[in-house]
A protein has these predicted regions:
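Alpha-helix-loop-beta-strand connector modules within alpha/beta enzyme cores
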Residues: 54-72, 124-135
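Glycine/proline-rich, positively charged
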Residues: 81-148
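Solvent-exposed, non-transmembrane amphipathic alpha-helical segments
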Residues: 21, 25-26, 56, 77, ...
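Active-site beta-loop-alpha junctions enriched in small/polar residues
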Residues: 9-11, 47-49, 70-74, 108-111, ...
Length: 148
């Protein structure tokens, strides 16, 4: 087991400083994934927010990888039922696009979402995904020390 993960944002959209060379072609993604497997890199970091990244991965059969995806950024000041419906929709779309029945992990993409009123609804939803074996691991993306 290797402790590295492949970030897949550029598999689905122009991403990064200057975004050169831009979105990676599907043939190049296939080569990257094959090389990753040959070197025992078995984890992929993706998100529905990464353009067509999840769809691209689904086209290439990522059953052998531990796939970690992320929630959307919630824009409301308080987490409400519409947010939970969107979370459910997004997660199921991720599974469809990835052509998987479950993923290894789900990260809350914005730690600030956990500080909002109603955040316990997000946590309950994600814990239910774990209970129903749709995910194995739960986590959060951290961008600032204050979130630790």
């Amino acid at each position: 087991m290797n402790r590295l993960a492949i970030g897949t944002a550029q598999f689905g959209m122009d991403y990064g400083i200057g975004s050169s060379p831009g979105k990676v072609s599907i043939s190049e993604v296939k080569k990257i994934l094959e090389y990753a497997q040959s070197t025992n890199i078995d984890m992929l970091d993706t998100a529905s927010a990464y353009g067509k990244s999840e769809k691209t991965l689904g086209e290439l059969n990522v059953d052998e990888f531990k796939v970690v995806t992320k929630t959307r950024h919630f824009t409301n000041l308080k987490i409400n039922d519409d947010d939970l419906n969107a979370l459910n929709h997004d997660f199921n779309k991720s599974l469809r696009d990835l052509k998987l029945d479950s993923v290894y992990g789900l990260l809350i993409h914005n730690a600030d979402d956990l500080m909002k009123p109603g955040a316990s609804k997000i946590i309950e939803f994600i814990q239910n995904l774990k209970k129903t074996k749709k995910i194995k691991k739960i986590g959060v993306s951290i961008y600032e020390n204050k979130h630790l």
